[in-house]
């Protein structure tokens, strides 16, 4: 009887240790899995872009330009290549994430969302694209490190086969109702938005960039 009780207690201790280790590793493992999923989605997007004919690509660009200028083009079809319309790369904070054409909670838990009614991410003077992402998730970093960016840093949007490079010009923390995304005729802008402080989420961190020449061009 004592032998069985001893074995039972030993089993319980092992179980507690296994559960504890699992809980400790869960955020790291989940983050790794989500990052791999994002990489796979971006690879699929690039493959789909490479298979587009020039006519198809031109039509998509024209539809996106029409939407940006007038809002008349079908938003969900303008850059439709599956769920992803572009992807963002921010080397300084190790961000490499797909961009979806919605800002639902489901999307923002795994990727970056494009804010409807703002310019689609194709660039051009008089455009202002707004991208939103969560911060502080235990399973996915997303825009958690956005506050580490400084004025002068750059980020890149990859849309179709174009690389749109933006240099950070302003960083501000404001109330949600004060977030603005007006277009300026002579500027090509993109703003990255996330909630702050992490876990409180009463304000918005807005990192705005202006388009600069891509050194690879």
List each language-model region with its residue ranges.
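Solvent-exposed, non-transmembrane regions of membrane-associated and secreted proteins
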Residues: 6-217
């Amino acid at each position: 009887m004592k032998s069985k009780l001893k074995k039972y207690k030993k089993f319980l201790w092992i179980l507690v240790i296994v559960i504890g280790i699992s809980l400790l590793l869960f955020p790291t493992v989940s983050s790794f899995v989500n990052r791999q999923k994002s990489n796979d989605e971006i690879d699929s997007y690039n493959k789909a872009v490479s298979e587009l004919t020039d006519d198809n690509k031109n039509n998509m660009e024209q539809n996106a330009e029409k939407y940006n200028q007038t809002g008349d083009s079908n938003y969900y079809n303008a850059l439709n290549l599956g769920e992803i319309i572009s992807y963002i790369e921010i080397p300084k904070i190790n961000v490499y994430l797909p961009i979806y054409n919605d800002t639902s909670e489901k999307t923002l838990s795994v990727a970056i969302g494009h804010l409807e009614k703002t310019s689609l991410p194709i660039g051009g003077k008089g455009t202002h694209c707004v991208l939103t992402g969560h911060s502080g998730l235990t399973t996915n970093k997303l825009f958690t490190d956005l506050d580490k960016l400084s004025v002068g840093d750059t980020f890149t949007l990859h849309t179709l086969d174009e690389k749109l490079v933006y240099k950070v010009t302003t960083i501000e923390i404001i109330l949600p109702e004060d977030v603005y995304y007006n277009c300026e005729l002579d500027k090509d802008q993109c703003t990255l938005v996330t909630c702050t402080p992490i876990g409180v989420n009463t304000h918005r961190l807005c990192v705005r960039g202006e388009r600069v020449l891509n050194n690879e061009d």
